[in-house]
Amino acid sequence: IHTLFGDAGWEMGLGERFYLVADLSLLQHFVYTVNDKPVRDTSEPSAYDDARTELSALVSARYRPAERFGIALNLRQEVIGNEGAPFIPALLLDWNPFGRVVFKASVARNYRFPTLNDRHFAKNMLLPEEGFTYDGGVEAEGSAEGASYGVSLTFYDSYIRNWIFWYPDKGATQWLPTNIRLVHAFGAEASARAAVEWGRGWSARVDALLAWTRSLNMREPLNEADNAVGKQLPYVPVWSGAVTVRLQWRSWTVDYKWNYYSERFTTTDNSAMITGRIVPYFMNDLSFGKAFRFRWADLSVGFKVNNLFDEEYETELSRPMPGRNYGFSLEITPRFRHP
């Protein structure tokens, strides 16, 4: 996969209360895949060579009628290949009643074309996703000498037509995309962060996230025995969470990450049989890093231990994931001198 990207933006303030932003972006994707099976299975989609241009234009108007209240209207137009999307508007509101507490709300139209992979493996039979999303929440932050914190809570609700969903076919040996006529997606996300610094270059930071996710199949029943309507989509956990802890001393860092995923069903009717569910699991990762600064570049090296406690788990039915494994990274960022 190769992608070329271009972007141009423009901003202008009209007084102290009105602000205009315009952005134009262009993506050119090139995808080439190879079927490396000794004998090609003609029942599966073959390797392909394809390309697509994606053009997106955005105009945003932001207005603050009062010091603690803001409103923004976004208008987006997209052209994918030779297909144009309808206008995609979004209305955003924010209110700061006191201190560093902000309430936010928005309503936005959704319209998403199938990706090149979606389109190919569905043999060009997919429809674009479309619908509306509503969300609202509150954010608060504060600070003291050498320390800072922040918390947020967000609720969202959406009805999406023609939801693009990948499902395991042929005994879970192949995944294929399809459209689900109507999906009701709603839930909540809570996050918190805290950071502290003390003498001699020491600092620490903790980030936590908890998500409650409901994605319900709301299409019309196919027949009287159809038990999939109103059920959670396969492989979508209702609960998930993550905690990341970073300890830093000068240019040395240690990161610990904990993830949790609740039970996930593998069938559309949420069958409770053994082969119809994937049990909850925890995941723990630990990494170490060191940064170096040179006149010609910034360099960072890292060592990571994935699945620290050698947990046995699956993310897909009958496909065990690796036990404890290790990784090494090297990142070089050149530092160009200006004349």
What are these regions (language model features)?
Residues 1-85, 96, 152-155, 192-194, ...:
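Face-selective signature of the C-terminal outer-membrane beta-barrel domain
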Residues 2-4, 49-55, 85-87, 130-134, ...:
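Residues that define the transmembrane beta-barrel architecture of outer-membrane proteins
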Residues 6-12, 57-63, 91-95, 136-140, ...:
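Residues on the lipid-exposed face of transmembrane beta-strands in outer-membrane beta-barrel proteins
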Residues 16-20, 67-71, 99-103, 143-151, ...:
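Repeated loop/turn-to-beta-strand initiation elements of outer-membrane beta-barrel proteins
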Residues 64-68, 148-149, 155-159, 179-266, ...:
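Gram-negative outer-membrane beta-barrel transporters
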Residues 96, 102, 106-160, 167-197, ...:
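Outer-membrane beta-barrel signature, preferentially recognizing the C-terminal barrel domain
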Residues 105, 132, 202-210, 231-339:
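Conserved C-terminal beta-signal and adjacent last beta-strands/turns
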